[in-house]
Amino acid sequence: MPHPPLARRHVGRFIAWAVLLATIGAAAGKAQQVARVRATIEAVNGNNLSLTTRTGDKLTVSLAPNVAVVAIVPVRLEDIKQGSFIGCAAMPEPDGTQRALEVHVFPESMRGTGEGYRPFDLKPQSTMTNGTVGALTGTVGRTLTVTYQGGKQTIVVPPDTPVVTYEPGSPALLVPNAHVIVMGRRTPDGTMTATRISVGKDGLVPPM
């Protein structure tokens, strides 16, 4: 069970979370910078989370007063339709295509979040494409044409690629053993304050 003060913390609307998510990667000032940490919750102590990162490091994160929490849940590859707005972490291929490492399908309320193509930190040399699915082909796996303002990418999605979507969440999801992606402000002394947290629902490890 989450600590009572944590459970009472106000969570912003789902759309407000999407607006915050769109700012990932922007600098937060000279004294602070935006950080993203993939981790497992070890303990919840009031407004603090004790985490073990995927690289094995220990980290304590404090929660901002307006921390936004969202759940990540699995969906099927077949749920990606023409016109879907998606994000996709991928690896560049020699032929210029992108091979998907994961795909996250945005709810309509989050359409436009982070639109574009850029480097990503899931793996060395990985990329992130957020855009609208145009052409969609293939019966074993899928090949997607994803368009965004100023460009497009052809993304090959193998049949075993994890596909997820977002649901509104609450701090009640922040429990020991939950897998999370924490985004927030980190100061030069290593202190981190979480402003938004994505939580894998029912033990899911967020693939992004």
Model features per residue range: what roles?
Residues P2-L6, W17, A22-M208:
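Short, flexible, surface-exposed loop segments at domain boundaries
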